[in-house]
């Protein structure tokens, strides 16, 4: 699928997710829904949760929103509270070596969305979305979903 066609894909973001993304963008940063919520939406499923990735650093995210929780701030993750709901907002990052298979020994914050998507496990989870930009799918996750293939990013 060509990038032009991917840009024409429209997903319905929950109102609170849209508000978080727009608020971050209003402050001059990039922000996208990312990962499993994008995959599930493309498959017509209702996501269990919505994750957001951003070029804003954790302290910048905390300065934008009145209610946040330091969920995993050393890994760039802040939970933004919207009413009683929490949404994880994570800074673009490049992960160091994984010692336990799940948590990186070190992280380096980045300002590049593609660098952040590279660290994800599977191509079908390495997609990001926001209405004004459309779908960002540099690792052909849609094609893998259509072929019913689970492929690691980088393979």
Per-range role (PLM):
Residues 1-155:
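Catalytic cores of the polymerase beta-like nucleotidyltransferase superfamily
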């Amino acid at each position: 699928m060509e990038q032009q066609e991917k840009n024409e894909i429209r997903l319905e973001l929950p109102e609170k997710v849209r508000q978080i993304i727009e608020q971050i963008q209003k402050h001059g940063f990039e922000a996208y829904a990312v990962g499993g919520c994008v995959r599930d939406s493309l498959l017509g499923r209702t996501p269990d949760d919505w994750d957001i990735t951003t070029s804003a650093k954790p302290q910048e995210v905390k300065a934008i929103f009145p209610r946040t929780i330091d969920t995993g701030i050393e890994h760039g993750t802040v939970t933004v509270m919207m009413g009683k709901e929490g949404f994880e907002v994570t800074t673009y990052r490049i992960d160091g070596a994984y010692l336990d298979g799940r948590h990186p020994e070190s992280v380096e914050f980045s300002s590049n969305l593609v660098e952040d998507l590279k660290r994800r496990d599977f191509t079908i989870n390495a997609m990001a979305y926001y209405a004004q930009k459309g779908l960002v799918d540099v690792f052909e996750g849609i094609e893998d979903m259509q072929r019913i293939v689970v492929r690691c990013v980088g393979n």
